[in-house]
Design a protein with these regions (language model features):
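Short amphipathic alpha-helix that is part of the acyltransferase structural core
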Residues: 1, 84-116
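Active-site rim helix/loop that mediates acceptor-substrate recognition in acyltransferases
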Residues: 1-10, 111-138
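Alpha-helix C-terminal capping segments
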Residues: 9, 45-49, 56-58, 64-65, ...
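Acyl-donor-binding surface of acyltransferase catalytic domains
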Residues: 31-88, 205-210
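Conserved active-site alpha-helix within GNAT-family acetyltransferase domains
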Residues: 61-72, 164, 186-204
Length: 212
């Protein structure tokens, strides 16, 4: 199922993320511009329901504050030099290991708010970009991640209690002085981990509300 980066009606312009519907039944709506947001939101809602959405979340307009709050997306940053070093090893995902990486990712992310399911197409894109990694220590798999430039886009522990090591390994693989990441405000355990490593909250990227 394809997304609609520009979903336009006579009542407004927005974005619809529908690719999660086959896996989780979830759709996301972002209101970009509307002079009649209530009417436009209802159009987005009905469209998402027609294509099979069972849970719908929306962001982008103050009208949404009348709905139940779901989560915020928080940006955090840290100085790379402030993150503890680790002797764990980092290995890029290959065409032989992408299947296992994807399996771990989908298992660990299935209960994380606003995390996307990794489809075959998304896994292929990851492999082409070359920014997916396994983190090992003493021959044991600790976790996986996605990192490039100055960003960490995914952290998932495989072995319980190894989140700090996974984050440290990914951070020190980056060629930058600062590292940034984004996390759902409801993922309190991850936020505590990042703060313990020296990350600070720098921005609230978006707020999401449950509209269906």
């Amino acid at each position: 199922m394809r997304d609609f980066p520009m979903f336009t009606t006579e009542n407004g312009v927005g974005s619809l993320v529908l690719k999660e519907i086959p896996y989780s039944g979830i759709a996301y709506v972002t209101i970009r511009d509307s002079s009649v947001p209530k009417e436009f939101l209802n159009e987005c809602l009905e469209f998402c329901k027609v294509v099979g959405a069972q849970h719908i979340y929306a962001s982008g307009h103050e009208i949404l504050t009348s709905y139940p709050f779901h989560t915020s997306v928080i940006r955090m940053s840290a100085a790379v030099d402030a993150i503890p070093q680790t002797d764990a090893s980092i290995f890029p995902v290959t065409d032989k290991t992408i299947g296992r990486w994807r399996e771990i990712y989908n298992d660990r992310m299935k209960c994380v708010d606003n995390a996307a399911f990794m489809s075959d197409a998304a896994a292929s894109d990851l492999l082409k970009r070359g920014d997916g990694y396994f983190i090992h220590k003493d021959g044991e798999l600790l976790g996986i991640g996605i990192a490039s430039d100055d960003r960490i886009d995914c952290v998932a522990s495989y072995k319980p209690g190894c989140g700090r090591t996974v984050v440290s390994a990914l951070t020190h693989a980056l060629m930058s002085e600062q590292v940034i990441l984004e996390v759902a405000s409801t993922n309190e355990r991850a936020i505590r981990l990042y703060e313990s490593l020296g990350f600070i909250k720098t921005a609230e990227i978006s707020k999401w509300y449950k509209i269906f």
